[in-house]
Amino acid sequence: MTTSNNHPNWPSLSDRQGLLRDRFPVWTPLTLDGLLAKNAQDYPNRVFVLTDRQSWTYAQMHAWSTQLAAGLCHLGVKPGDHVALLMANFPEFIAIKFAIAMVCAVAVPINFLNKRDELGYVLKQSDAVMLITMDSFRNMPYCRYLDELAPGWQVQGGGDEFPKLKNVLVFATGENGSDNISKHLLLNASFGEGLVLPPGFAPAPNALCDIIYTSGTTGFPKGVMLSHDMLLRTAFGSAWARGFEDGRRIVFSLPLYHVYGYVEGLLACMFVGGSVVPQLKFDAADTLSAIEQHQATDVLLIPAMTMALIDAQKVQPSPLHSLHSVISSGGRAPASLWQDILDYLHPQEITTGYGMTEVTASSTVTRPSDGMTRWLTTNGRLRDVGPAGEPALNQRLVVYRVVDPVSGQEMPPGQVGELQAKGPGVMKAYYNKPDETAAAFTADGWLHTGDLGYLDAEDYLTLVGRLKESYRCGGEQVLPSEVEDVLMSHPAVLQAHVAPIPDERMGEVGVAFVVLRDKMSCESIALEALCKERLARFKQPRHVLFLSASDIPTTPSGRARKFLLSQMALESLGLITPL
């Protein structure tokens, strides 16, 4: 066996990929429950999921998920039904996720930062027949939201407002008492106990597995439809491209309702019989402690998290001897970040990349052998996924072309245009949104990403901006129109326009430009309170600026020119010198 030069006891990338090829020499389409069953047989006593208090082997997780699946079946969940899952990174999320697959149902993971109306929209639009929710988490009162959305939900499910929602199960997090919730509605250790999962459930690999909601240009979230095999081929591709060693152990606090933590962490580790240490929330000290305590070899981060870890290491360094790999992706990163990772986290391999829910997760990554220049100047190379890839696409699942957004002409290497994606890793449709689906694709079947960038001659991709007005705050996508609608619900507000500005910690943050009605007044604190009440934290604007209608730069058709608003915000806040 050969070894990496910078870590003499570590297998080389070719050896690690060889192990994966030995286990999966030819790609055979898989399902989530099928992969869990395979690992429960191949690695029954290997730890799969760890917390600071408990761990579950593959065999134990399979048994737990089977029990939960029997409980779901007993409550009437049928193949093809949609089961909404509003839960943080508890082990129960993982167990119920596989249970949903076992009964051939479709999971609808929901962002647990969603407020009442956001939750209601997803429940209705997804046609969920069941909701599995926490009672509360980080002071988010989900049961109160249900009381307001669907009074009597404990007895009649969604009622008239959500006629397809038949059952709600509640997981008690321990934050608040759940004494007022009937025991038969609780997702606890006894749920499904004594029941037997009927035979005959066998989801097809190309069957719908998840509907994962992402913001879009319509002002409302859109449900991206992903099959079992799309998810697992992409997850295998992550393990292949990053060179997972046997038994890789991954720490992350990225939420499992996102493809980043779900695909690149939970599912990817399964292909090497590895384990995950999911954390309920991000805390730099806790993350470093988890790496040490559980001897993790990998950590999944967005740049804001990476910078927080580096800051913590500067104050009270941990040795992190086990940490071999760091992936930092999903937002803007300062140029100093990559050297700081080497200096303070000491990994042997660093990865960054680019992806989105519509392409199932990462579709470009830097290679383990890449160095500082690639980290600084690119978002990775089109990802070779080994045996899981398409031979016609050079063993890739997603390929990109760069197109002039005005003329539609394909651009040569090095020229900036809109990035468009195609391949078996690209979604087929948004759930129950035919118009949005049609608008998302070109006439010849390429997905509009809405991002501007370029490819070089070696297929490395570099992002330079966004065609869309949406932006990412802390890795979460924000749609300005959604924030603007909330601001304009205030009686004193005539116009509201939200535009992003760069932020070293969060990647981008929103600035709200507000025009007040004549003879009416309003303080920024009132608008901030309104947003705090109605919107998830990452959607709340960092700054509120007041101006007159004549000061809003507009197109001839009267639409606000957001890139000029971003420039105005930077000048007004003193972050750049006015031109």
What are these regions (language model features)?
Residues Q293-L300, I310-R383, V399:
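Gly/Ser/Thr-rich phosphate-binding loop
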Residues L30, L75, L86, Q409-G414, ...:
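Conserved ATP-binding/catalytic segment of the ANL
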Residues P44-N45, F162, L169-V170, E175, ...:
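Conserved pre-ATP/AMP-binding loop-to-beta segment of ANL
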Residues F24-P29, D33, A37, N45-F90, ...:
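Conserved AMP-binding/adenylate-forming core of the ANL superfamily
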Residues L75, A105-H184, D518:
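Structural core segment of the AMP-binding/adenylate-forming
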Residues S4, Y471, H497-D503, V511-V515, ...:
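Conserved C-terminal "lid"/linker of ANL adenylate-forming enzymes
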Residues T57-A59, C209-R233:
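Conserved AMP-binding A3 loop
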Residues L232-R249, Y257-D298, D311-A312:
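Conserved AMP-binding/adenylation subdomain of ANL enzymes
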